[in-house]
């Protein structure tokens, strides 16, 4: 599993950082956790990019306790 920690990243830098992360791992079947913290704006930026790449994702863990990350497979 790969992790991208966007916590404390300025929103303007999230999109290019995430795109670079995705493209470096494209079609490798890598499970990835994208750490967003609890910022709704940060999550919205990440989800928009994941949608553009048509990647399935889940926000947080199954129990709904930790909602500060987004899980996907690249």
Mark where each language-model region is.
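Long, charged, low-complexity intrinsically disordered regions
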Residues: 1-74
